[in-house]
UniProtKB/Swiss-Prot annotation:
Gene Ontology cellular component annotations, sorted alphabetically: cytosol
InterPro entries, per database record: Ribosome_maturation_RimP, RimP_C, RimP_C_sf, RimP_N, RimP_N_sf
SUPFAM superfamilies for the chain: YhbC-like, C-terminal domain (SSF74942), YhbC-like, N-terminal domain (SSF75420)
Family the UniProt entry places it in: Belongs to the RimP family.
Family annotation (HAMAP family): RimP
Organism: Bacillus cytotoxicus (strain DSM 22905 / CIP 110041 / 391-98 / NVH 391-98)
Keyword Disulfide bond included in the entry's annotation: no
Name recorded for this polypeptide: Ribosome maturation factor RimP
Entries under Gene3D superfamilies matching the protein: Ribosome maturation factor RimP, C-terminal domain, RimP-like superfamily, N-terminal
Functional note: Required for maturation of 30S ribosomal subunits.
Amino acid sequence: MDKKVTEVVEALAQPIVEELNLELVDVEYVKEGKDWFLRVFIDSETGVDIEECGAVSERLSEALDKEDPIPHLYFLDVSSPGAERPLKKEKDFEQAVGSQVAIKTYEPIDGEKMFEGKLLSYDGTTITLLLTIKTRKKEIQIPMDKVANARLAVTF
């Protein structure tokens, strides 16, 4: 992912989503096959609908055309983050306390790099998860600097 592109797009998108009383959740700029995709995820306390996604897409498209930070063709996709919303900001982790989450780490912790469990606490530097391994439960602490990515996890 091109960090510079996502930073420029975040800077362009932030005032647009704020003006519409929405939250900018994440920006992804990825190549899939031969095509480039710029994905912008928005949300609000009550969720977002297609009209809000369309309004952000239209305004952001105009801003991107004017600023022109991407040198080649790409597809712009504005949508909600879905049920398995990524956890990126402190606020995301704070709101997710008590929820099921999936965490991937840069390096193994207790021999594992993938964890799924209940987020018990978040203090800004450490995540505490309650893992269920077969019939027993285990608490694990994961330093934030070891977290590669985190998201809400849907369980059935």
